[in-house]
Amino acid sequence: IFAAVRLLLKKYHAESAILFGSYARQEADAASDIDLIVIGGSKFDPTDVFCIAEELHRTLGKAVDVYELRELNVGSVFYNTVMAEGVQIA
């Protein structure tokens, strides 16, 4: 997962990503999806989260949920959970 994400971050000019959910907690099983927050930069187009999700799905054969950090409400339960359990990539 990490290598595939790193390649796509570079391709789409994103700064980094945060893996969260079952893969970050090391609780994933065969049915688990991949949950990812992308941290864009000045050259990142936020609509590219869809491209990243699709390419990861094709590469890894897993369902993928990708969000851009700016989509999250700072201080929300979701945001706090991601920040608490997330694993930085890149």
Q: Where are the model-predicted features located?
A:
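Short beta-strand->loop micro-motif that forms the acidic, two-metal-ion catalytic signature
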Residues: 35-39
